[in-house]
């Protein structure tokens, strides 16, 4: 007999007396022998291992107090006496965190225990055992802190779950992080995410099964393609794909052509400059021009005109701050233009003024053009996504920040541009912060370029210091006084009373359902409430009457306050002087729901007295322009807007402002790689901006619907967007601009983002194929950088073009880029849901539902019945029109990239919904979750979050079953739980072929994706087929991107095999758990289960039974244990309508094991079994699932 022997040393406290154990291993059986007790101190470490068999693999940690012996048979894990040493298996985002690099201790129960306590004797001993346990943990954590390489302690001990609160408090005092994952306790040096798939025993693994004969048919097409590949697909010359893209942007805000002959340049441009000068002077001298000049002189900016122009002439960078209404946005760019034209440099100057929003760029350009007596598109123009107006003589261009960034892709030095004005930098948008880094690097190479930064707040010093102490100038604003009414003031004067019930905002059934689902997961106070909790507790409202104080005690910080807003509006409409009302809300849901409520009001919903308008960034430009028009006499205009109305736009006739004090902004949880969309408190600067909108034309009133003490608790300024959003698109732009290392470049930002956020973004771009392992742009990445959409949506467009199913893919991408076209009126919700379900069919896809709705609208438009179609089907015609315009832009961009020639040729396979579903999967990945159908519910799990939910508006959100194993989704948002939006169900074959790279696992027939998070088990020959198809498919995409003229018909046999596989996969496989323990090895006869129990103590019976039931699609077995009079226990296990009674045993654990043993004996027919017999037992259980057999035993002994 060949033996291993080792001395084991556990975790002990100083001077503790323990027993050492000698371990003798014969093949796979383990026997333990106690040696005499030894006195061991923490400083002494046993480091000796004795191996008496050549070829044995002996591993140990020199720094930990865990010694492990691993058999040379290749077992995946090794354990000794309840201590396990293993490497953490983490998803790609969590692997980036160095905190999971090494596990110091991994304690687990050496035998299964029930979760239910029996008897009172254990409870009486809890206090003493807890103290001993905490002492042991204090030593473990001390050792963890001393060892620099070890990162965390992992325990599966039941006593540690029992004492987790105490252990967690101890860890916190020692500067460590703690979290409990189901039955596992983890203490770590690094912050811990909400979910760890490597510690999830219920993480699904997929067994893939294809219909009979499908694999052989697919293999035939594949082999035929491989045989003809060398002769059919010749080597084609490579070309730089970025060149064709760049050349296609010749008409996209290109600068003046640089003339080689300066004399010729002067001869041509001089007359044009004189012409512009003459035209400008004629306008100034005209009566209309004199009147406009007189108006402009009344603006505060005019007084600073000369000083501003002098500072710009003398400095390359100037920072200008100005209060709302001072005229900086409309006047300063004009002053520069007028100065250049007056100096006869009009034809050579080119001024670009960026705005953070489309509506701002359009409205400001129209205003400036009108002040110059011109039509838009002459000397003043604009360019935003989907539309623009500019001409040959346009010298001042207003555009969004994204437009300027896209120009930098093809014009790195901004040739011909003389001035760049970046407005609203105080908002700290991600594009604006990124643009500042790029411009800061560009200025030394362009000493003639002038940069003017404009802010609406007085934080100019921050930007001045960033640009090396650039001069900062301030324009004092002129606004009429605005009286502020905080919540306590309005309650005192109006007598309105707050109660628990009138603060429930009415979103209709849909929103109420979502809030109820979220409440199930709510375990702590919301961020809104906790942020102001201290301020409210310290507040003193003694100066107010009892009714007011009582209302304030009931005030809910989480409520937007629909009813309160309605009351304030009635107060204004009934008793206040004329003037428009601007109501600041958090987002479209709030605006739409409040608008519905107000329209149902007898006064506020009367169109003869009130004009209700909405203002949101996703609305069409024509709708947004309505807010600037003055209403008819006697009608009060009420505008419901988001925070975009703080500074970006100015509604001149606003006299009253209602401020809810909140804004819905995306924050980003880098540790869990999850965006969070929650209302948050605005900053003091934003509150002042909102208040200032009321004093434009006369003294105004501002109603802050929160107490003054809450305002005092606000942050001074808003957190930059760069620190609170995912960075994938930004990182792609950095690489496309050739700016070097992503992390190094972003470290130069005004306020650099978290390193983990950058790592997550880079890993994402690598997964979708935009970057290679060295962070270089791939051909796909170069194409993605030229498309004005998110990388995942751009990938869908490119693949749709390659595989000739572009038309529906353009519709999907356009729909995901704008607001959802499906409307959900409060009073017609059921009808709206019925209309939506009509488009969904049985495809289980929000994306294909969108395609059908759009196609129906296009058909209706051809017969001039589009409006009726939208009205009947609860669709937004404006959104559908925006989608239509965006589709045209996508087509033109792809055509310029030479990926398509005409719409007919690139949409030949648009009818193939299976192929379209595959393209959607390719774009959405790695946004994938598993779908496990249960009897009354559906369980969804993602890699970073564990269990998630679907929004009820999804076509998949209200179905009893989804007959697909996977969902790919566009977006996930954490509200209180994590919700998925815009999902499509896909099969195993679609995910394997169009998802991430697939690799072979530990044995034949085992495939892995996403670093092993997704695991698939199948026949080895089928695994080879998937690997071969995936390899050829990736090569096809690569060749097409490098050589856009490549004829895809050469790959017809390959595409036939792929289309056949994705269309005929019937999802006949199943999810299993713990499948690695059942890995296919050569069948070897074992002893019967009874003998196995004797040798191993029955430790595996409960686990084995659990695995069998899971594979057969049953729930977990239920154990009922009863204590008998003779201090023995008897247990009964129940599953699938079957009860099995075990024999009396000395402990509860052994009683449950014996009951599991009886169940396994029955399933095996009391015969000898092999590992292959597990499949037979699973099939037996599946048959029993449809029948309710007689119970094996129903009486207690």
Swiss-Prot record:
SMART domains from the UniProt entry: DEXDc (SM00487), HA2 (SM00847), HELICc (SM00490)
Positions of short motif DEIH box: 423-426
Gene Ontology molecular function: any one: RNA helicase activity
Protein's UniProt keywords contain Coiled coil: no
Pfam families hit by this protein: DEAD, dsrm, HA2_C, HA2_N, Helicase_C, OB_NTP_bind
Keywords: ATP-binding, Helicase, Hydrolase, Nucleotide-binding, RNA-binding
Keyword match ATP-binding: yes
Sequence ranges assigned to domain Helicase ATP-binding in this UniProt record: 309-476
Reactions this protein catalyses: ATP + H2O = ADP + phosphate + H(+)
Entry-linked InterPro entries: DEAD-box_helicase_OB_fold, DEAD/DEAH_box_helicase_dom, dsRBD_dom, HA2_WH, Helicase-assoc_dom, Helicase_ATP-bd, Helicase_C-like, P-loop_NTPase
Ranges for domain Helicase C-terminal: 564-738
Organism of origin: Arabidopsis thaliana (Mouse-ear cress)
Binding positions for ATP per the UniProt entry: 322-329
Residues annotated as transmembrane: none
Record's protein name: DExH-box ATP-dependent RNA helicase DExH3
Family to which the UniProt record says this protein belongs: Belongs to the DExH box helicase family.
EC number(s) given by UniProt: 3.6.4.13
């Amino acid at each position: 007999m060949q033996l291993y022997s080792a001395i084991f040393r556990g975790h002990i406290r100083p001077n503790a007396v323990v027993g050492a154990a000698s371990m003798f291993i014969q093949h796979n059986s383990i026997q333990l022998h106690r040696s005499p007790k030894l006195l061991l101190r923490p400083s002494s470490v046993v480091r000796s291992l004795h191996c008496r068999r050549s070829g044995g693999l002996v591993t140990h940690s020199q720094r930990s107090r865990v010694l492990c012996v691993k058999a040379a048979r290749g077992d995946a894990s090794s354990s000794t006496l309840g201590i396990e040493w293993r490497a953490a298996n983490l998803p790609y985002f969590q692997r980036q965190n160095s905190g999971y690099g090494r596990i110091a201790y991994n304690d687990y129960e050496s035998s299964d225990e029930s979760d239910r306590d029996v008897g009172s004797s254990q409870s009486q001993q809890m206090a003493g055992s807890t103290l001993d346990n905490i002492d042991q943990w204090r030593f473990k954590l001390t050792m963890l802190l001393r060892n620099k390489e070890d990162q965390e302690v992992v325990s599966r001990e039941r006593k540690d779950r029992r004492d987790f609160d105490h252990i967690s408090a101890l860890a916190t005092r020692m500067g460590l992080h703690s979290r409990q994952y189901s039955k596992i306790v983890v203490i770590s040096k690094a912050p811990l995410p909400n979910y760890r798939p490597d510690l999830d025993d219920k993480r699904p693994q997929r067994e893939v099964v294809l219909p009979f004969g499908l694999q052989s048919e697919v293999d035939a097409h594949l082999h035929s393609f491989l045989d003809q590949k060398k002769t059919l697909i010749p080597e084609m010359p490579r070309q730089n794909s970025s060149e064709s893209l760049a050349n296609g942007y010749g008409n996209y805000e290109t600068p003046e052509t640089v003339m080689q002959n300066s004399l010729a340049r002067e001869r041509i441009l001089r007359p044009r400059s004189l012409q512009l000068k003459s035209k400008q002077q004629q306008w100034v001298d005209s009566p209309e021009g004199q009147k406009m000049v007189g108006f402009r002189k009344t603006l505060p900016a005019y007084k600073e005109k000369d000083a501003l122009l002098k500072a710009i002439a003398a400095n390359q960078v100037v920072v200008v701050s100005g209060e709302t209404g001072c005229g900086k946005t409309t006047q300063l760019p004009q002053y520069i233009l007028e100065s250049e034209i007056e100096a006869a440099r009009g034809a050579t100057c080119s001024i670009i003024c960026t705005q953070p929003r489309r509506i701002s760029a359009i409205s400001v350009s129209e205003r400036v053009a009108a002040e110059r007596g011109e039509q838009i598109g002459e000397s003043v123009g604009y360019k935003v996504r989907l539309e623009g107006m500019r001409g040959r003589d346009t010298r001042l261009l207003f555009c969004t920040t994204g437009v300027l960034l896209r120009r930098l892709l093809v014009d790195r030095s901004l040739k011909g541009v003389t001035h760049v004005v970046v407005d609203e930098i105080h908002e700290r948008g991600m594009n604006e912060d990124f643009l500042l880094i790029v411009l800061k690097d560009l200025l030394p190479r362009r000493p003639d370029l002038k940069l003017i930064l404009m802010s609406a707040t007085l934080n100019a010093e921050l930007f001045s210091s960033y640009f090396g102490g650039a001069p900062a100038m301030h324009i004092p604003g002129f606004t009429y006084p605005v009286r502020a009414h905080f919540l306590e003031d309005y309650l005192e004067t109006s007598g309105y009373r707050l109660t628990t019930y009138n603060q429930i905002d009415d979103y209709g059934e849909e929103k109420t359902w979502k809030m109820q689902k979220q409440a199930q997961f709510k375990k702590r106070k919301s961020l809104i409430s906790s942020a102001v909790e201290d301020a409210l507790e310290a507040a003193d409202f003694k100066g107010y009457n009892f009714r007011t104080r009582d209302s304030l005690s009931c005030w809910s910080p989480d409520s937007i306050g629909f009813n309160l807003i309605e009351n304030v509006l009635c107060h204004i409409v009934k008793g206040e002087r004329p003037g428009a009302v601007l109501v600041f809300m958090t987002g479209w849901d709030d605006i739409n729901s409040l608008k519905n409520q107000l329209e149902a009001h007898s006064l506020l919903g009367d169109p003869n007295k009130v004009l209700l308008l909405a203002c949101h960034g996703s609305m069409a430009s024509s709708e947004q322009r309505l807010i600037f028009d003055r209403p008819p006499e006697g009608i009060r205009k009420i505008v419901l807007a988001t925070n975009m109305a703080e500074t970006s736009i100015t509604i001149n006739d606003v006299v009253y402002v209602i401020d809810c004090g909140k804004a819905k902004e995306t924050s980003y949880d880098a540790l869990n790689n999850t965006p969070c969309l929650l209302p948050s408190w605005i900053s003091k600067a934003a509150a002042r901006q909102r208040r200032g909108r009321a004093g434009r034309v006369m003294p105004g009133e501002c109603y802050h619907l929160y107490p003054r003490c809450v305002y005092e608790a606000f942050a001074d300024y808003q957190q930059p967007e760069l620190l609170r959003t995912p960075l994938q698109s930004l990182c792609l732009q950095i690489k496309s601009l050739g700016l070097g290392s992503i992390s190094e470049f972003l470290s130069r930002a005004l306020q650099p983002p978290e390193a983990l956020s950058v790592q997550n973004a880079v890993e994402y771009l690598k997964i979708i194929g935009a970057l290679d392992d060295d962070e270089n742009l791939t051909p796909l990445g170069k194409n993605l950088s030229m498309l004005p959409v998110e990388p995942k949506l751009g990938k869908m467009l490119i693949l749709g073009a390659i595989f000739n199913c572009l038309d529906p893919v353009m519709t999907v991408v356009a729909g995901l880029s704008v607001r959802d076209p499906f409307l959900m009126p409060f009073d017609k919700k059921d009808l709206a849901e019925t209309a939506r379900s009509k488009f969904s069919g049985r495809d289980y896809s929000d994306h294909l539902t969108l395609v059908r709705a759009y196609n129906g609208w296009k058909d209706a438009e051809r017969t001039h019945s589009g409006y009726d179609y939208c009205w009947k089907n609860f669709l937004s015609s404006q959104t559908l029109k925006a989608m239509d315009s965006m589709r045209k832009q996508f087509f033109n961009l792809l055509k310029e990239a030479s990926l398509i020639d005409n719409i007919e040729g690139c949409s030949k396979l648009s009818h193939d919904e299976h192929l379209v579903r595959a393209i959607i999967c390719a774009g959405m990945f790695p946004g994938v979750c598993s779908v496990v159908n249960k009897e009354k519910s559906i369980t969804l799990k993602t890699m970073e979050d564990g269990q998630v939910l679907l929004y009820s508006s999804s076509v998949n959100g209200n179905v009893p079953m989804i007959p697909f194993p996977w969902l790919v989704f566009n977006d996930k948002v954490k509200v209180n739980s994590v919700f998925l939006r815009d999902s499509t169900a896909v099969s195993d074959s679609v995910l394997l072929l169009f998802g991430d790279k697939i690799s072979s696992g530990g044995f034949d027939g085992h495939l892995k994706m996403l670093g092993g998070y997704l695991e698939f088990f199948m026949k080895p020959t089928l695994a080879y087929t998937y690997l071969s198809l995936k390899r050829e498919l990736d090569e096809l995409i690569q060749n097409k991107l490098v050589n856009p003229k490549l004829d895809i018909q050469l790959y017809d046999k390959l595409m036939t095999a792929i289309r056949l596989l994705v269309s005929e996969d019937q999802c006949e496989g199943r999810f299993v758990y713990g499948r690695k323990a059942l890995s296919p090895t050569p069948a070897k006869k074992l002893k019967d289960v009874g003998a196995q129990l004797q040798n191993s103590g029955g430790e595996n019976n409960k686990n084995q039974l659990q695995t069998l039931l899971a594979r057969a699609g049953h729930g977990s077995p239920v154990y009922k244990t009863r204590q008998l009079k003779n201090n023995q226990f008897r247990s009964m296990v129940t599953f699938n309508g079957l009860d099995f009674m075990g024999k009396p045993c000395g402990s509860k654990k052994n009683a449950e094991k014996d009951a599991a043993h009886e169940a396994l004996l029955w399933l095996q027919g009391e015969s000898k079994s092999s590992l292959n017999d597990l499949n037979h037992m699973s099939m037996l259980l599946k048959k029993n699932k449809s029948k309710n057999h007689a119970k094996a035993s129903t009486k207690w002994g």
